[in-house]
């Protein structure tokens, strides 16, 4: 068992039982596997996040692929997105609102208001603040970016529906916890809340059938 898993188990008996039931989850391997499904650069990852909002994984992948096709198979540079024909972007599958969002992302990058190269040097809170300044990018998206792109070790998205469901089941709560309650329950998991999040998501995949 990894040092992080041992610390989680020691900090919380419910998490200890979950770890024993599910076995070892290697944080780096799992995050790397997930990252391989997304663009490698920060700009592409955020662009892909906007495209995929409120869509199934399959639909998001299809639409993102169509957008890449508009730009010869490559992630469009911010300048290209701003100059792109809206009709073409809509035909690829973007809604009018998402066209506005991807262009706002491009504008922030070009204006230097979102300095992607320095995100690695910022705290988690500062990264979230930078990202949510872009229209269409909310706190949840910023938290997933922290976890799966920047691979930060202590990310817990209290508002994530899957995590809330898992916490309700594992902690035997009568009602689904509020985001604030999830963060309260997860306080003992610091500084390994990213690993705890993976265990909670994994618990849903391994839940017994009704």
Per-segment meaning from a language model:
Residues 61, 80-81, 134, 175-179:
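A short linear-motif detector with a strong N-terminal bias
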Residues 51, 123-169, 195:
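Catalytic DNA-binding helix-loop module of base-excision-repair DNA glycosylases/AP lyases
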Residues 1-122, 126, 184-210:
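N-terminal polyanion-binding entry modules of DNA glycosylases/AP lyases
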Residues 76, 159-187:
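C-terminal end-helix/capping segment
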